[in-house]
Amino acid sequence: AGHSCGGAQVLANAKDPRIKTYLILNAGMGDMEMAGASPKSLKNLHAPILYLVGGKGDVAWPNAQKDYDAIKRVPVVLADNTQSGHDGTYRQEFGGDNSRMVSNWLDWLFKDVKEHDALFKQGDLKGYTGWTIKSKNFKE
């Protein structure tokens, strides 16, 4: 997991076979190169990936959108807390909705919490006001 520039560090290490999921928080490569990562790093992904951004006011929003479009081989979700900006909701108690989204992702992947299927596969944002979400590359 990595926030902001830390997202590039995650992608720079995408080949690591120990990785079971990627969390790219308020980050994205787009067309840039930094921290040892570039758009080519997306080809090294081998596990499901969650991008979480903060709307068009988030400096990372356009790059996350480009990454989502470029990822073809692994399941990818782009969750957009449209009004939260680049800092997200992490300063709120317990990290706010952004932390809840990440927790639901981890529970869904690693604890097989089926109730989150609708959230991550069908975009059912019940309980997430002001969000949009899209996903692709999941096997049915």
Label every PLM stretch briefly:
Residues K15, K20-Q92:
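The feature captures the conserved acid-bearing segment of alpha/beta-hydrolase catalytic domains
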Residues A1-S4:
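Conserved alpha/beta-hydrolase "nucleophile elbow" surrounding the catalytic nucleophile
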